[in-house]
Regions:
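Short, flexible, solvent-exposed loop/turn segments with mixed acidic/basic and small polar residues
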Residues: 24-29, 57-58
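Extended catalytic/binding region for NAD+/ADP-ribose chemistry, centered on the ART fold
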Residues: 28-53, 127-131
Length: 159
């Protein structure tokens, strides 16, 4: 079993893996209209992945971290930097990357797509397909309050 993580605002913590955000807005690995949930293999990576999308002058005050336990038998496909197009890290992401996640979700051949993080390529993000039959085997843990350390926002260390 592996535990993966997602940081969300509290109102979204009741259904954190429903894929609603990517469905509405898309992401690096999915187009709008594709329902997948983005998680990270480490809490620290989830922190970085969320942090790059917030306004440092007005960070959300209602963040929570959600952990999900994925049994070893849940099907997954693993892609590495070597198996991706050479331009997989830039911002904005090329549309060819969203096509990868769109195909993964539509084909429903596996429940998980493991991909390298564009921010930390040696670590992985996990796309979960909430429409795959094995999704029911994923155990979502209760959300816990989460706050970034003030130093992320330029606050000086005390003392």
């Amino acid at each position: 079993m592996i535990r993966v993580y997602r940081i969300v605002r509290k109102p979204y913590s009741r259904t954190p893996l429903d894929g609603e955000g990517p469905y509405r807005f898309g992401g690096r690995w999915s187009s709008p209209g594709t329902r997948v949930a983005y998680l990270a293999e480490h809490l620290s990576l989830a922190m970085i992945e969320y942090f790059v999308h917030i306004e440092a002058s007005d960070p959300p005050k209602d963040l929570v971290v959600v952990a999900a336990d994925i049994p070893d038998n849940v099907s997954r496909v693993v892609l590495t930097p070597r198996t991706l197009p050479p331009n997989w890290r830039p911002v904005p992401a090329p549309p060819s990357l969203a096509a990868i996640g769109d195909s993964f979700a539509a084909e429903r051949k596996s429940a998980i797509l493991v991909l390298p993080s564009a921010l930390v390529p040696s670590e992985s993000n996990w796309l979960v397909n909430p429409l795959h039959p094995q999704f029911a085997e994923i155990q979502v843990q209760p959300a816990e309050a989460f706050h970034y350390d003030a130093r992320f926002f330029g606050a000086a260390e005390p003392g």
